[in-house]
Every structure is written in C-alpha cells, then in structure tokens.
Amino acid sequence: MMMMKTTIMRNFVLPSIEDVAGKAGFLNYTQLKKMAEENRRSFHLKCTGTNQNVNGLSGGNKQKVNLGRWLAKDLSILIVDCPTRGVDVGVKAYIYDCLREAKKKGIGTIMITDELVEAIGMADNIVVMKNGEVKKTIGRSSGFNEEEIIEVMV
C-alpha cells in the first residue's frame, strides 16, 4: 500500500529497503536517493523532485509511484488491483506498457479489474468470479468472447 503522507522517495524505496541496507542494517541515504531518482526518471513522474509528498501528485503520477515501487524490485509475481482506475488515457497506456514489459521479464501478473475491455486487452487468461467463487476460466487461446464472459458474470 502506498503511503500518501510521505515522500516519493520513501514510497519508492520502502519495498526495497532490505536490498539497500548495509550489513549492519544501516541505510545509505545517497544510495536511497539515487534509487528514487532512477525510478522517478524511469517512470516519467511529473513532480518537483523525490522529496515531494505523494499526496501532491496527480492521480496518474500516484499510480506510477505505486506501480513503480514494486516493478523496481526483482519480482516473480505482481498483483495489481484496478491499476488504471481514475487515470487519463495516456497514463493508462503507459501502465499497460509497464505491465507488458513485466511480462516480457517473466513477471507473472494477476490483474484485478472491473473493466471487461481492459481484461480482454491485457489478459492471457480471464477468471470470472462471482460471490467469491470462480465461475469460469477462459484462455486467450480459446478466444475471448465478450458476450460469453458477460453471460458468466451475470
């Protein structure tokens, strides 16, 4: 979970803190700042700097921080919950690109979404759940049929 009342830098480095702590557990501020700056540039954040509080960012930039803090780690799986909710079309496309790039790197992604078009466009498999139960799993290879998916959802 992203911390809204703290800086971009702290949000970026918190999930990776054990990766940058020295042998005695001390943190190297210079290394933390460098890591945050690299992430700021890599994720094209529009901000005054990594010392800016996250709550002062636009919705799209908040989402970039939230996604970027995890993609900066060496992950095997990423779970995202409505990653494009409330962002403009440009940021939405950028987030999709980030998720596709993660897939190319071998990071398995579970995307929770309530947008059917998003699920069809991004997924290799769609799992339709209703009332906490899996109703159907549909693979891209068998073809995503929007009407069929809606029928299972209703």
Question: Where are the regions that the model predicts?
Answer:
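Glycine-rich phosphate-binding loops of nucleotide-dependent enzymes
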Residues: 1-154
